C-alpha cells in the first residue's frame, strides 16, 4: 500500500488515538523524515515522545522526527499577520472588539485556517520528501474540523476564503496526499463509532481511510478448560475471562470492517501505567510491518 503524504489520526476518545499517532510517526521516521502535528490540547502524542512544544515551532525528537503544536487560535493570528504584515497593526486588530465580532460572525474560521495550515504543511512535506502525521481531535470533533470548508463556502461564495476552501477540499479528497487512520478498541461502541466515522468522511468529504487500528488487543492466555479451573480465584478469574473476551471480540469485529472496505491492524495491549518511548517502539514495529511496509 502507498501511504499518503499526510496521515490524519482520529478515533473515539479513550481508544489510544494519540499513542497510535506517536507510534506511526516514530515508525515512519525510520524510513524518511517525519513531522508529528499535535492538535490535542493535552499534547499527549508529543508527551509520549518526550517533546513539549509550546508554539508553532517544531521541536526535534530525533534526527528524522520533529513535533509541532498547532491550535486554531494561533493559526488565525498567523493568518492575520500574513495579510497585515505590519505587526503593530495586526496585533491591534486581533485585540479589537470589532475583530471579535467578525470572527463570531464566521463560525469555524479558526478551524478552517488550521486546515489551510495543514494543507500548506503537506505541500512543504512533499517538496522535502517527508511525512506529516496529525494527532487530530476525537472523531466527532475531527469530522467537524474536516467539514468546515463547506461552511466557509456558504458564507463566502467568492473571494480568497472561497478559493482556499476549494484548495482544502481538493487536498482532503486526494488519496495520494491525505488519508485517515481511525483508532478503535474491541468494544462494540468504539467499533460502531469508527465505522460511522469512516463512512461519514468518505461519503461527505471523499476522504479515504487508510486503515482501522484495533488498539489494546490482549493475547489469548487461556483456553476454555483453563478458564474453568481458574474459577476459585474469583476476581482474578473474571479478569482472565474479560481478557479472553477482548481478544475474541477483535477477531469477531474484523469482518465488519472488511465489509466496509477497511483493513484492520491489531495492536497489542501495553500493560504499563504510562506509554513511553519503549512502548512506542514496540507498537511502531507492528505498524511498520502491517501498515507502512505492506
Predicted regions and their residues:
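ATP-hydrolysis module of ASCE/P-loop NTPase motor domains
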Residues: 86-122
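Conserved catalytic-core segment of NTP-binding enzymes
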Residues: 15, 19-23, 30-31, 35, ...
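P-loop (Walker A) phosphate-binding loop of NTP-binding proteins
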Residues: 12
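N-terminal phosphate/diphosphate-binding loop that engages ATP/GTP or pyrophosphate donors
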Residues: 26-94
Amino acid at each position: 500500500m502507498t501511504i499518503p503524504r499526510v496521515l490524519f489520526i482520529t478515533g473515539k476518545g479513550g481508544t489510544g488515538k494519540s499513542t497510535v499517532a506517536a507510534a506511526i510517526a516514530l515508525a515512519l521516521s525510520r524510513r524518511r523524515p517525519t513531522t508529528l502535528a499535535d492538535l490535542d490540547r493535552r499534547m499527549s502524542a508529543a508527551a509520549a515522545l518526550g517533546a513539549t512544544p509550546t508554539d508553532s515551532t517544531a521541536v526535534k525528537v530525533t534526527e528524522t522526527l520533529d513535533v509541532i503544536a498547532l491550535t486554531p487560535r494561533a493559526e488565525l493570528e498567523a493568518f492575520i499577520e500574513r495579510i497585515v504584515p505590519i505587526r503593530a497593526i495586526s496585533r491591534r486588530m486581533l485585540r479589537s472588539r470589532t475583530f471579535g465580532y467578525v470572527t463570531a460572525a464566521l463560525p469555524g474560521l479558526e478551524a478552517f485556517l488550521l486546515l489551510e495550515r495543514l494543507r500548506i504543511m503537506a505541500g512543504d512535506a512533499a517538496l522535502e520528501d517527508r511525512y506529516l502525521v496529525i494527532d487530530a481531535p476525537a472523531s466527532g470533533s475531527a469530522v467537524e474540523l474536516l467539514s468546515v470548508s463547506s461552511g466557509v463556502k456558504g458564507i463566502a461564495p467568492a473571494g480568497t476564503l472561497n478559493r482556499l476552501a476549494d484548495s482544502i477540499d481538493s487536498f482532503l479528497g486526494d488519496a495520494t496526499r491525505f488519508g485517515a487512520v481511525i483508532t478503535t478498541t474491541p468494544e462494540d461502541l468504539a467499533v460502531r463509532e469508527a465505522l460511522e466515522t469512516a463512512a461519514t468522511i468518505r461519503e461527505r468529504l471523499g476522504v479515504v481511510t487508510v486503515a482501522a487500528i484495533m488498539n489494546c488487543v490482549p493475547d489469548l492466555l487461556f483456553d476454555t478448560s483453563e478458564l474453568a479451573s481458574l474459577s476459585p480465584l474469583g476476581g482474578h478469574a473474571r479478569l482472565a475471562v474479560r481478557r479472553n473476551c477482548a481478544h475474541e471480540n477483535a477477531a469477531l469485529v474484523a469482518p465488519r470492517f472488511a465489509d466496509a472496505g477497511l483493513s484492520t491492524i491489531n495492536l497489542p495491549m501495553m500493560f504499563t501505567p504510562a506509554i513511553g518511548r519503549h512502548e512506542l517502539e514496540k507498537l511502531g514495529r507492528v505498524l511498520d510491518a502491517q501498515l507502512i511496509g505492506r
